[in-house]
């Protein structure tokens, strides 16, 4: 369920897609079940949309998830700010469009641009002045009136006539993607005991710490669960998981039959989401937690040292709703329903853009 406010009545350049078009450039496994959440994608012709973001996987996944769910044809445009501007907050960039490659700016602008994060917001707001309809994912940290639609998670605490509020971060977890991943990974993970626990591990962030001590604690808690509850375990690290921490997890868990992705070959992430009976995820990543709760598996949160007020609000809301519980070193299983607002948010975005 999303929280929405009345549709846009008017704005400056690019308020609705028709305006943007007119003002833009003219040369423009049998034993396993997949954790699939009900979701409907809009049936409409694909409209080109740039997804503008810093090159961070979590940010890019949110923008791509929205664009795909909205039946746009997404083209990823990673930002490349030059020295010295990359060391300055994006809202202070004198020429935001200079963060895009020259060949990008030489091309015809698309009907829609989707910004992700603070830097993406600044660039997309500038592109809106040139005629593209501007959609922003996450709190933009600048005036929301510079966008046609802003999609913000409820823990952002953002409101306004062009704001659509979602319970979780947007993502690319869809029934089709999970079903495909389940079919491809069921055989590869069939040797693991059931119930299967998927573990999604993050890493150090600006607000949470995941070093050797935290990795050792998590590894031994997971090992204790494997022994006490006789579960299979499949773990995937993230790009932020340090090599020493990965080695420690592997040293403790692999001798006990745990499977840990070594970073080679196909990424198992969606396969683990699809096939898991229970998911354990570290609390440092709102995106990973959002993707986990979009499945039909119970989700347990592995606490880490540190604090973020916004992320605390996010996690606590999911705890209060019974969708997640804290991981305490034992298997826990309870009935849950998927939480996924991406498709509804995408439909609302299309409506507000007049599509």
Whereabouts are the PLM-identified features?
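Active-site and donor-binding regions of nucleotide-sugar-utilizing enzymes
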Residues: 51-165, 171
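A nucleotide-sugar donor-handling region in carbohydrate enzymes
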Residues: 145-211, 327, 333-339, 343
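Leloir-type glycosyltransferase catalytic cores
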Residues: 316-355
């Amino acid at each position: 369920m999303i929280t929405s406010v009345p549709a846009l009545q008017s704005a400056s350049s690019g308020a609705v897609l028709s305006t943007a078009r007119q003002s833009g450039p003219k040369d423009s496994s049998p034993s396993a079940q997949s954790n699939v959440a009900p979701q409907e994608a809009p049936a409409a012709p694909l409209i080109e949309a740039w997804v503008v973001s810093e090159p961070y996987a979590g940010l890019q996944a949110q923008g791509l998830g929205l664009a795909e769910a909205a039946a746009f044809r997404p083209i990823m445009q990673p930002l490349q700010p030059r020295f010295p501007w990359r060391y300055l907050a994006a809202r202070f960039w004198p020429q935001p469009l200079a963060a895009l490659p020259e060949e990008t700016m030489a091309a015809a602008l698309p009907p829609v641009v989707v910004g992700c994060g603070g830097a993406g917001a600044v660039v997309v707001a500038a592109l809106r002045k040139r005629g593209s309809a501007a959609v922003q994912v996450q709190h933009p940290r600048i005036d929301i009136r510079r966008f046609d639609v802003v999609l913000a998670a409820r823990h952002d605490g953002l409101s306004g006539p062009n704001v659509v509020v979602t319970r979780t971060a947007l993502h690319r977890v869809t029934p089709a993607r999970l079903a495909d991943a389940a079919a491809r990974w069921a055989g590869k993970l069939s040797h693991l005991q059931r119930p299967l626990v998927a573990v999604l591990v993050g890493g150090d962030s600006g607000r949470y710490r995941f070093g050797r001590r935290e990795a050792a604690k998590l590894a031994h808690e997971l090992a204790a669960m494997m022994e006490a509850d006789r579960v299979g375990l499949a773990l995937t690290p993230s790009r932020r998981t340090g090599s020493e921490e990965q080695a420690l997890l592997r040293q403790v868990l692999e001798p006990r039959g745990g499977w840990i992705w070594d970073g080679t070959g196909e990424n198992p992430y969606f396969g683990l989401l699809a096939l898991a009976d229970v998911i354990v995820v570290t609390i440092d990543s709102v995106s990973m937690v959002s993707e986990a709760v979009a499945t039909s598996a119970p989700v347990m949160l592995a606490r880490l040292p540190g604090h973020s007020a916004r992320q605390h609000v996010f996690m606590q809301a999911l705890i209060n709703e019974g969708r997640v519980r804290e991981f305490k070193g034992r298997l826990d299983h309870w009935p849950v329903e998927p939480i996924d607002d991406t498709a509804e948010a995408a439909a609302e975005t299309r409506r507000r853009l007049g599509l």
